[in-house]
């Protein structure tokens, strides 16, 4: 007899009910709880899975390169990137009627195609790719790499090639290698690629495998480098009249500090980007020699942490080294939090300081990339707190951490939680109060009675960075200050860029921005409150001091202790997910509506209508969904119909979530038993039999299913709205 799923848990495999399948899926990646798992084996399994993860990423990118080369219009797009829309891939659908075939035969294609809103065309072009052949070569190269990584993953699971536990616990060596190798050398390699391939291509000089060794990127060669005359590499940059991809107006500089944007592409100067990566390479290669390893030189993180006792912090950072180094959940929490912050920063910088040629003028792509990265940041941040809470339940040792900063966080958690609660209440009541007041007075025909607050502090900060519009005359916006004269010498293009009014750098802000900023602050603080409370109360609370004994997720502690439902760390994570999505809604609505005004040259629409609730509902959501709702109708379809369909489908998935979120165990148990009863009495259907006794989802499982539907539906609905409303206006 074959062993039943899951193989990793004999206990579950012998469960006679459908719980076996659900719990099997739920714990498949919870390696710590698997039968016979040792600490060493745990680390080895996770390590091997990283190779698989990287292989999947390479495979995915290879697929993008391949489909663009095979079915895209890359070579045509390069000739006119502002007017030709990039094609992602062809669509083959047997359900298409003639109307749909015609609607989706777009962007100069001879058959139905999808338009690319990912920005990959701009990226390929910027880094020096100009032909389909180069894209194919890249796709094959990544396929080979993916195979190599899959093999490496398999190899590191073989007994002879499994790293030891001591190797995994050697944090200093790992940090040195990751800092110097992963960040330092890869940044150096990227700077090298930009200097040797991308910059010459941008100046109309092709560099390929056939000539890259014989084509020096700078006429002076390496002589200035070895003689210390490095300024030569910054002399003679591209002129303002440079036509990207040609030698017209091109200079010879390779490492510059120009600031601002290339006038034609509206993206950062490639020579500035190369300089940036070279600087990062130098810093990180030095940083990668910082920590003490086998040679006894450099810093010991353990010694630093144990010695570091700041004022009012008790035992300070004592024993934190071992606490972190012995807890994978702590490490994962830190990694997710860092990556979450970086991903959000990427979203903010991709539109304000676009680095890829012509991407700033592809408005739909800009909107899609901003929203995409902010959503990913939201999921990563919630995951960080989830694993922080699991750390407190599974890995935290109160004795080892006595009176250090971690223990003190737990000891004064009431102060933290109550302050966050106060901030959230303050923000919520005041922001909603202002919106509601404004909404009422506008509804009664007296818009002049709105309470409109100018964000003077934020405007002052913009002025310090050089925005002259507000007349603050401070630092960079004061032409006579030291900051301005220094800036003119070191970043000559910056002030032009910040004051141009046609890009997204330091957008002009007013009362509408002030209100929505505080709405977003409310969302962020409430999400943080729920997550921080969930993590700090994960071991126990006044209501349930022994909570840690019940694990990370439990529905309730039975009828004898009333009030213990919904207080596990899992429940906090579950609730925070809704707040996280809610916050992202406000954030992306704001960004999108603000930019629709900037792009269409009509900023007044946002400024006048974003100060009251009906303005948001009517002038952002309703007005921009008109084209979407008309994607298909009795008279035919247009090329937005796929988004219209996705918009409807997203709503359906989202609404399905509530069926699981609002009804619980009893309903499902009755429903399942009724369905089983009907099956067993229906001809043909009764030939199919369950081997497991069907039981309803547990409360936690039903919440997970509901949350998954809510989340997927929410994302699908807004993605369709965002892309269709922007593409409908700007193509």
Curated annotation (Swiss-Prot):
It comes from the Bacteria. It catalyses: reduced [plastocyanin] + hnu + oxidized [2Fe-2S]-[ferredoxin] = oxidized [plastocyanin] + reduced [2Fe-2S]-[ferredoxin]. Changing residue 522 to P: No protein or PSI accumulate, unable to grow photoautotrophically. Chlorophyll a B1 binds at residue 651. Chlorophyll a B3 binds at residues 659, 667. The keyword Chloroplast does not apply. Its main location: membrane. InterPro entries: PSI_PsaA/B, PSI_PsaA/B_CS, PSI_PsaA/B_sf, PSI_PsaB. The keyword Plastid does not apply. Phylloquinone binds at residue 668. Keywords: 4Fe-4S, Chlorophyll, Chromophore, Electron transport, Iron, Iron-sulfur, Magnesium, Membrane, Metal-binding, Oxidoreductase, Photosynthesis, Photosystem I, Thylakoid, Transmembrane, Transmembrane helix, Transport. PSI electron transfer chain: 5 chlorophyll a, 1 chlorophyll a', 2 phylloquinones and 3 4Fe-4S clusters. PSI core antenna: 90 chlorophyll a, 22 carotenoids, 3 phospholipids and 1 galactolipid. P700 is a chlorophyll a/chlorophyll a' dimer, A0 is one or more chlorophyll a, A1 is one or both phylloquinones and FX is a shared 4Fe-4S iron-sulfur center. It is found in: Cellular thylakoid membrane. It is an enzyme of class 1 (oxidoreductase). GO terms for molecular function: 4 iron, 4 sulfur cluster binding; chlorophyll binding; electron transfer activity; magnesium ion binding; oxidoreductase activity. [4Fe-4S] cluster binds at residues 556, 565. GO terms for biological process: photosynthesis. It is a multi-pass membrane protein. GO terms for cellular component: photosystem I; plasma membrane; plasma membrane-derived thylakoid membrane. The chain crosses the membrane at residues 46-69, 135-158, 175-199, 273-291, 328-351, 367-393, 415-437, 514-532, 572-593, 640-662, 704-724. Belongs to the PsaA/PsaB family. PsaA and PsaB bind P700, the primary electron donor of photosystem I (PSI), as well as the electron acceptors A0, A1 and FX. PSI is a plastocyanin/cytochrome c6-ferredoxin oxidoreductase, converting photonic excitation into a charge separation, which transfers an electron from the donor P700 chlorophyll pair to the spectroscopically characterized acceptors A0, A1, FX, FA and FB in turn. Oxidized P700 is reduced on the lumenal side of the thylakoid membrane by plastocyanin or cytochrome c6. The PsaA/B heterodimer binds the P700 chlorophyll special pair and subsequent electron acceptors. PSI consists of a core antenna complex that captures photons, and an electron transfer chain that converts photonic excitation into a charge separation. The cyanobacterial PSI reaction center is composed of one copy each of PsaA,B,C,D,E,F,I,J,K,L,M and X, and forms trimeric complexes. HAMAP family: PSI_PsaB. This is Photosystem I P700 chlorophyll a apoprotein A2. It comes from Synechocystis sp. (strain ATCC 27184 / PCC 6803 / Kazusa). The gene is psaB.
């Amino acid at each position: 007899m074959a062993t039943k799923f899951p193989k990793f848990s004999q206990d579950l495999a012998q469960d006679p009910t459908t719980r076996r399948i659900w719990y099997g899926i739920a714990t498949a990646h919870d390696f710590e709880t698997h039968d016979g798992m040792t600490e060493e084996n745990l680390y080895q399994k996770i390590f091997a899975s990283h190779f698989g993860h990287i292989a999947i990423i390479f495979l995915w990118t290879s697929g993008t390169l391949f489909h663009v080369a095979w079915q895209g219009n890359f070579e045509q797009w390069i000739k006119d990137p502002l007017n030709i829309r990039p094609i992602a891939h062809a669509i083959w659908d047997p359900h298409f009627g003639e109307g749909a075939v015609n609607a989706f035969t777009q962007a100069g294609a001879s058959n139905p195609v999808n338009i690319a809103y990912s920005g990959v065309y701009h990226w390929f072009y910027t880094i020096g790719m100009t032909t389909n052949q180069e894209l194919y070569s890249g796709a094959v190269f990544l396929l080979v790499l993916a195979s190599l990584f899959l093999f490496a993953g398999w190899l590191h699971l073989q007994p002879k090639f499994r790293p030891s536990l001591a190797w995994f616990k050697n944090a200093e060596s790992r940090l040195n290698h990751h800092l110097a190798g992963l960040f330092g050398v890869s940044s150096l390699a990227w700077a090298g690629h930009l200097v040797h391939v991308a910059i010459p291509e941008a100046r109309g000089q092709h560099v390929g495998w056939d000539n890259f060794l014989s084509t020096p990127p700078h006429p002076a060669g390496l002589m200035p480098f070895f003689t210390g005359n490095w300024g030569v590499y910054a002399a003679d940059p591209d002129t303002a009249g440079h036509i990207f991809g040609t030698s017209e107006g091109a200079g010879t500089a390779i490492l510059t500090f120009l600031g601002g944007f290339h006038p034609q592409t509206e993206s950062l100067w490639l020579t500035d980007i190369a300089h940036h990566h070279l600087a990062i390479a130098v810093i990180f290669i030095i940083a990668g020699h910082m920590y003490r390893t086998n040679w006894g030189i450099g810093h010991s993180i353990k010694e630093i942490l144990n010695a570091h006792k700041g004022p009012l912090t008790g035992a300070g950072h004592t024993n934190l080294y071992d606490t972190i180094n012995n807890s994978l959940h702590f490490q994962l929490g830190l990694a997710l939090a860092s990556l979450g912050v970086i991903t959000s920063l990427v979203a903010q910088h991709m539109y304000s300081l676009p680095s890829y040629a012509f991407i700033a003028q592809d408005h739909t792509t800009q909107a899609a990339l901003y929203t995409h990265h902010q959503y990913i940041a939201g999921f990563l941040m919630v995951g960080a707190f989830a694993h922080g809470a699991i750390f407190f339940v599974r890995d935290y040792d109160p004795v080892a951490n006595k009176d250090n900063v971690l223990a003190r966080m737990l000891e004064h958690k009431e102060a933290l939680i109550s302050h966050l609660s106060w901030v959230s209440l303050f923000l919520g009541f005041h922001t909603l109060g202002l919106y509601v007041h404004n909404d009422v007075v506008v509804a009664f025909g007296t818009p002049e009675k709105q309470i409109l607050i100018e964000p003077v502090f934020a405007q002052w900060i913009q002025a310090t960075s050089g925005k002259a519009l507000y007349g603050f005359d401070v630092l960079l916006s004061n032409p006579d200050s030291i900051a301005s004269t220094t800036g003119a010498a070191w970043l000559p293009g910056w002030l032009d860029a910040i004051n141009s009014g046609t890009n997204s750098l330091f957008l002009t802000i007013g009362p509408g921005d002030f209100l929505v900023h505080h709405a977003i602050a409310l969302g962020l603080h409430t999400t943080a409150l729920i997550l921080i409370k969930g993590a700090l109360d994960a071991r126990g609370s006044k209501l349930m001091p022994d909570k840690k004994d019940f694990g990370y997720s439990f529905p309730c502690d039975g009828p004898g202790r009333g009030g213990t439902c919904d207080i596990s760390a899992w429940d906090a994570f579950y609730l925070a997910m809704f707040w996280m999505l809610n916050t992202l809604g406000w954030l992306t609505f704001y960004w999108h509506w603000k930019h629709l005004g900037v792009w269409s040259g009509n900023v007044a629409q946002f400024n006048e209508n974003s100060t009251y609730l009906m303005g948001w509902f009517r002038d952002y959501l309703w007005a921009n969904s008109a084209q979407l709702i008309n994607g298909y109708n009795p008279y035919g379809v247009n090329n937005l119909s796929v988004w219209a369909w996705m918009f409807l489908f997203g709503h359906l998935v989202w609404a399905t979530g509530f069926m699981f979120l609002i009804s619980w165990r009893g309903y499902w148990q009755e429903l399942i038993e009724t369905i089983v009863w009907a099956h067993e009495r229906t001809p043909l259907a009764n030939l199919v039999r369950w081997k497991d006794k069907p039981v309803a989802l547990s409360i936690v499982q039903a919440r997970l299913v509901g949350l998954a539907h809510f989340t997927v539906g929410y994302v699908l609905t807004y993605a369709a709205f965002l892309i269709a409303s922007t593409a409908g206006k700007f193509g």
